[in-house]
Amino acid sequence: MTDQSQQFASDNYSGICPEAWAAMEKANHGHERAYGDDQWTARAADHFRKLFETDCEVFFAFNGTAANSLALSSLCQSYHSVICSETAHVETDECGAPEFFSNGSKLLTARSEGGKLTPASIREVALKRQDIHYPKPRVVTITQATEVGSVYRPDELKAISATCKELGLNLHMDGARFSNACAFLGCTPAELTWKAGIDVLCFGGTKNGMAVGEAILFFNRKLAEDFDYRCKQAGQLASKMRFLSAPWVGLLEDGAWLRHAAHANHCAQLLSSLVADIPGVELMFPVEANGVFLQMSEPALEALRNKGWRFYTFIGSGGARFMCSWDTEEARVRELAADIRAVMSA
């Protein structure tokens, strides 16, 4: 029998993966130094440097909103602006936190294509106005994978980076589902970040088997100056930091981070294939990560809810998002697909 609690509303619904749980259990033995001066935090940072093939600065925060907001605040001043997609999480789902932590840096939205920014859309916003009365663009933030499940290719990232360098803009990546992007493309983390010109990455673990704790990686180490103070001031310096960092050791040391992401991606592909031939169901975006976006009638969506399924519909009338997780059961995917077929034929 399948786990009936498994839902597709969010990959945050899932629990803690065995590797992260085991690492936390090991970290719970004995005493360790506080505030990040412990062996687990050092080991996690070293694992990141090895994985990304570079001597980056590594920090940890409790969640993605804090990670993104503090990272962006370190890249600009209050009179600057941050260019993002109109669907970016920092714009739509972080309750003004980027503006709050930067003391007022304004978010400027740019047109996206399939959820992705382009050099042209960045240039359009960055050069729209250059007078003293307008917040000066200083940062571009992109999401990998995007909020609609699309994935930036290395060449796309390099083109965006080149535009940023030309215009004097720092480049930040919201990597809440960075693992899923790596799994989809088969690229190394380095190829999708600093080798493509990314200055700072917020690497998400919560959506990939961790309980809490995102990593902030500064590839441009100059931008990390006093970042530890920002974390402390914002309440993001965990006193028992080892319980944020140890799960990363569990995920990174034997490749669990990539295996779990690949499984979630596979389940999304499975769902997409199972509903592809259902009349009245339309795939809104290509399935490249762990999300499936379907266009269905409102009565059909309501019928699905009445069957006990949970999902989000924030992407427009008739649009529904179904997210797969590191532990999603294929049988549960098939149950969802069968119910979608049933409500569409009713």
Swiss-Prot record:
CDD domains, sorted: TA_like
Domain of life: Bacteria
Summary of pH dependence: Optimum pH is 8.0-8.5.
EC number: 4.1.2.48
GO biological process: threonine catabolic process
Pfam families (alphabetical): Beta_elim_lyase
Record field: temperature dependence: Optimum temperature is 25 degrees Celsius.
Catalytic reactions on record: L-threonine = acetaldehyde + glycine; L-allo-threonine = acetaldehyde + glycine
Gene Ontology molecular function, alphabetical: L-allo-threonine aldolase activity
Enzyme class name: lyase
Location of N6-(pyridoxal phosphate)lysine modifications: 207
InterPro entries, per database record: ArAA_b-elim_lyase/Thr_aldolase, Low_specificity_L-TA_bact, PyrdxlP-dep_Trfase, PyrdxlP-dep_Trfase_major, PyrdxlP-dep_Trfase_small
Effect of residue 207 to R: 1000-fold decrease in activity
Record keywords, A-Z: Lyase, Pyridoxal phosphate
Cofactors, names only: pyridoxal 5'-phosphate
Subunit structure, interactors included: Homotetramer.
Family in the record: Belongs to the threonine aldolase family.
Function: Catalyzes the cleavage of L-allo-threonine and L-threonine to glycine and acetaldehyde. Can also act on L-erythro-phenylserine, L-threo-phenylserine, L-beta-3,4-methylenedioxyphenylserine and L-beta-3,4-dihydroxyphenylserine.
Protein name per its UniProtKB record: Low specificity L-threonine aldolase
Source species of the chain: Pseudomonas sp. (strain NCIMB 10558)
Gene expressing this chain: ltaE
